[in-house]
Amino acid sequence: MFLSLVVYLSKICRYLSMFSSDRLTVPEYVSSRLHNRRTAPDPRAVSPGISTDVQAVLDGSLPALRSAIRTLRSSKDTGDLEETRRAIAETFQLVEEAWVLPTVGRRVAEEICNRIRLDGGLELLLQLMQTPAVEITYESAKLLEQILVSENRDYVARMGLGVILNLTREQEDAQLARSVSGILEHMFKHTEETSAQLITNGALDTILYWCRGTDPTVLRHCAVALSNCAMYGGHRCQRLMIEKQAAEWLFPLAFSKEDELIRFHACLAVAVLAANREMEKEVVKSGTLELVEPFIASLDPDEFARNMLDSADSMQGRTAADLQHLLPLLDGTRLEGKCIAAFYLCVETSIKSRQRNTKIFQEIGAVQSLKRIVMYSSNATVCSLAKRALKMMSEEVPRRILSSVPNWKSGEVQTWLQQIGFSAFSERFQELQVDGDLLLNITEQDLIQDLGMTSGLTRKRFLRDLRVLKTYANYSTCDPNNLADWLADADPRFRQYTYGLVQSGVDRNNIVHITDQQLLTDCHVENGIHRAKILSAARRPSKPCLTDSQPKGPDVFISYRRTTGSQLASLLKVHLQLRGFSVFIDVEKLEAGRFEEKLITSVQRARNFILVLSANALDKCMGDVAMKDWVHKEIVTALNGKKNIVPVTDNFVWPDPTSLPEDMSTILKFNGIKWSHEYQEATIEKILRFLEGCPSQEKPDGAKTDKKEPQKK
């Protein structure tokens, strides 16, 4: 009893510290009213399911909350706009303070958000969002964004979806966009049906329209909304996203250099879309997917977690239900999905360890998936992230398994058995000298009769792990024609059949003549559907060989300065790509190689050359006699190749011609197009005329006029 009293008093002390000078800054009239209302309440019994420390905070907050909602109701009835704004501000302050509380923040905030609904506050907010007074609409939407916990999302989906959809039509209202994009971010987590309803009524169109903008708050909400739609919306919503070119519009977000959280959620969204085999090729074609791995490899999970802890939206981390949606990426076949899911789990482990809640990862099954990656994956980035996550979870990190399974001796088989949890059978496997060859040919009958694996479920577990091993194994020593990759191209799961086919004498040349019966009896492909798909793939016409003729070059090469021109360059890429142009834009990649040669070759092979002239874009070219600057090299290559050069300016001041090296000074004679963020479609139409019509350098007089504009400003 004494111990309980001590614990309770310590929680009260922690609660009182909330009201120190470190509290969030709010309008003075709100602070004074809150101070008057927050008198210490009498001790009350703890509500069922709520811990004492959570109840202690609620006892101080709920009276003020009830008072604010009463004020909100009365001021709405009387039409007192100033009093309405005060009540909304008080409620917002209580909610925001709850979300940033350490340890108990999520539980306190959820109780407060639910209480707002139960006391009628949510209904009032939906009504206020329809009033003619725009300031009330703005502030009501801002508060609604903060209180959309699970039960409140249910209410809005049933009673207020029309209100939200009406607000999404106000695409040009920048202040409203900040809140409505946040509301959509939450609502795309609700159900597949709600997401589909939002998409079919224009909400996704609005999100994609806002992806063109520059407001970091709106862009962050858009990135998270798209990742939520992809993760929680199911196959139907993923198909709708592809039809509306969401994969393409994710490119500017993933390419952004301004905000890592924007890039991260954009990469997560495109990785989830690519995990759907039905639309994988369309996602790959967008070009966004190749941004994922280099970006993730450049991040530090601990630093990223600290940034999330600084954000009120993310500081509590994700729930178990949210994290479970990462498992299909971890267990999938796309490297990008594994990479971003492993990184996300590292970040969440860092947050959950502060909350002393790392057991959540064992409960959702993430630990086994991470161990499988460590054992089998050959990608250094994914492997290191999986190891790091396991260490932070205080889990055992398994050893990397040698990939040349056909060449395994019995010792390697023993190691593998121990790491997958079948050490009880190690002795029997050792007695029978089971090596890699025998392991790859093992059948369920062998497990029962020779290896003593009598339990049916145990055999299923073993065969499941064996399928994973067969899928990851390297067959190069026995598969000279690379049948393994051909099977994986038909379906990544079919790689497990490689050894059986190769041992039976099948290769890429004669597979077209194989029958269903031969696949079953000789190659041991027992799944009839798999046999049908393999035979169908074998009878498809082979792809034309391009070794003799070089593939066609891109329609457009986009040259830009990374520090200031990334966003405009990425927008141009998407606009042109959606209009049927093939576009090359330099993307930072991990693989080594002759980078300079590849880049110059791309300029030479392109028909058009768009030069993005953002702020200070040519500064590094000045005095660059040795041509070490990349933009300088690209411009000179385009000039020498007589490309159709189209400069696009954005906050750019044309330099003195004498300040540029002589080999690129003629670039100043080209007619440039001034970019307009507000009228992007009109600007793109002008660029299209330049690309499809005569070269821009034929109009030097127009160029001189255009170049004077920024200086006049």
UniProtKB/Swiss-Prot annotation:
Annotated ARM repeats reside at: 53-96, 110-149, 151-189, 192-231, 233-276, 277-310, 311-350, 355-398
Domain SAM, residue spans: 408-472, 478-537
Q: How does it assemble?
A: Homooctamer; forms an octameric ring via SAM domains.
Q: What is this protein called?
A: NAD(+) hydrolase SARM1
UniProt organism field: Danio rerio
Following inactivation of the gene, the phenotype reported is: Absence of sarm1 provides a level of protection against axon degeneration. Schwann cells are protected from chemotoxicity by delaying axon degeneration. Absence of Sarm1 does not promote axon resealing.
Q: Which UniProt keywords are listed? A: Cell projection, Cytoplasm, Differentiation, Hydrolase, Immunity, Innate immunity, Mitochondrion, NAD, Neurogenesis, Phosphoprotein, Repeat, Synapse, Transit peptide
Looking up Pfam families in the UniProt record yields: SAM_1 (PF00536), SAM_2 (PF07647), TIR_2 (PF13676)
Q: Which residues form the active site?
A: 634
In which residues is NAD(+) 2 bound?
561-562, 591
Report if keyword Nucleotide-binding is assigned: no
